[in-house]
Amino acid sequence: MDVVEVATPGGSYPIHIGPGRLDALDASIPADATAIAVVTNPTVAGLYGARVEAALARTGKRVLRIELPDGEAHKDWQTLNLIFDALLENRLDRRAVLVALGGGVIGDMTGFAAAVYMRGIRFVQVPTTLLAQVDSSVGGKTAVNHPLGKNMIGAFYQPVAVEIDTEVLGTLPAREVSAGLAEVIKYGLILDAGFWQWCEDNVGALRALEPRALAYAIRRSCELKAQVVGQDERESGLRAILNLGHTFGHAIESGLGYGEWLHGEAVGCGMVQAAELSTLAAGFPAADVQRVRDLVREIGCPTVAPDLGAERWLALMQVDKKTEGGEIRFVLMPRIGQALSRAAPEADVRTALERTTR
C-alpha cells in the first residue's frame, strides 16, 4: 500500500492507495462517529455496496445507504436534497460520517453535503473511477452544477481520508479509463515533464490497466496534486493551474449538455485547445502541440472539439470560476511541465478555436 499525505489549512489527511482498500474502510472511520451514511449510485452499489457495508459494519456503528441517480445530469440541487432528506429522516447528527462511494459526481455531491449539513460533518472519499482517484477526490473541492455553469455552487471542504482501491478499476468501461487518463497526463503537462514523458512511454500499459503502471500513475498524480493543494488550498493562485483544459472543457460540457461527453473527455480535448492557445499566447512550441494531440488521442479521448460557434464558445467560457472582472483567464503552458494562469487576447482565443473545432 502507498500512502500520500495531504496537508492543508482546512485539514490534513492520508490517501491510501492499493488493492483491497474496500475491505479496510472501517479503519478510516473516526472512533467517535455515531453513524455512517454511504452515498453511492445503483451501478456502484451493485458492484461494491454489500462489500463496503460489511467492512463498515465492523465499526459497530449504524450503516445507512443512500443511492442517487447516476450521471453528471443529476449533479444538481434536486439530487443533493435526496442526501439531506435521508440524513434528516434517519436523524443523523453532527458526529455522523458520510462515505462517498463512486466517481466524481458522487464525491463532489457527498463532499458538498458534508460541508453544509448541520454546518459541517466529516466524510471519507472512496473513489471508484480513475478520474476520481487521481483528481476529484483529492483537494477538497465539492460542488453541484447550475444550468448556467458547471460546479458553480460549492465549497472547499477536506475529507478525513481518501481510500483508493486500485482493483475496482477492472470493472470500468474503457471510455471511463480514457477519461481518467486525461487527468493523469494533465499533471505531467503542468508540473512534471519527466512524468509526461513516462506517460508517453507507458500509454499502452496504462490503457491496459497494467497494475504496476497504474499504481505509479495514481500515486504520482496524487503526489503532484497534494503538493499544489498544500500550497494553495482555496485556489487563490497556484492551484489554478490544475484547471488546464477545463475552461474549454467546461464549455464543451455545458454547450452539449452535461453527460454528453465525460468530464475527462472534455478536459482531454480542452488540453489540446489550451496547447494551441499556448502557442499563440505563451510561446509553447508548435511541435509540442502535436505531442499533446497525439497523447490525448492515444489515451482514447477526442482531440477535435464540437463547433458551437465562436460567439457561443466565448459566452460559455465567460461563465467560469476563473473569470475575473469579465476577463476570461486560461491555464497556458510556456513548455511541457510548466503552466501559468492568465488572460489571453480574444483574437488568439478565436484562432485557437478555429484550429481545434469542427
Curated annotation (Swiss-Prot):
Major site of localization recorded for this protein: cytoplasm
Cofactor note as given: Binds 1 divalent metal cation per subunit. Can use either Co(2+) or Zn(2+).
Keywords: Amino-acid biosynthesis, Aromatic amino acid biosynthesis, Cobalt, Cytoplasm, Lyase, Metal-binding, NAD, Nucleotide-binding, Zinc
GO cellular component labels: cytoplasm
Binding site for Zn(2+): 183, 246, 263
Gene Ontology biological-process annotations: amino acid biosynthetic process; aromatic amino acid family biosynthetic process; chorismate biosynthetic process
Class in the EC hierarchy, top level: lyase
Residues given in the record as NAD(+) binding sites: 70-75, 104-108, 128-129, 141, 150
Catalytic activity: 7-phospho-2-dehydro-3-deoxy-D-arabino-heptonate = 3-dehydroquinate + phosphate
EC number: 4.2.3.4
Cell compartments where the protein resides: Cytoplasm
NAD keyword on record: yes
MF terms (GO), sorted A to Z: 3-dehydroquinate synthase activity; metal ion binding; nucleotide binding
Cofactor(s) recorded in Swiss-Prot or TrEMBL: NAD(+); Co(2+); Zn(2+)
InterPro entries per UniProt: Dehydroquinate_synthase (IPR050071), DHQ_synth_AroB (IPR016037), DHQ_synth_fam (IPR030963), DHQS/DOIS_N (IPR030960), DHQS_C (IPR056179)
Metabolic or biological pathway: Metabolic intermediate biosynthesis; chorismate biosynthesis; chorismate from D-erythrose 4-phosphate and phosphoenolpyruvate: step 2/7
Pfam families, per database record: DHQ_synthase, DHQS_C
Family that this chain belongs to: Belongs to the sugar phosphate cyclases superfamily. Dehydroquinate synthase family.
Free-text function comment from the UniProt entry: Catalyzes the conversion of 3-deoxy-D-arabino-heptulosonate 7-phosphate (DAHP) to dehydroquinate (DHQ).
Protein name as catalogued: 3-dehydroquinate synthase
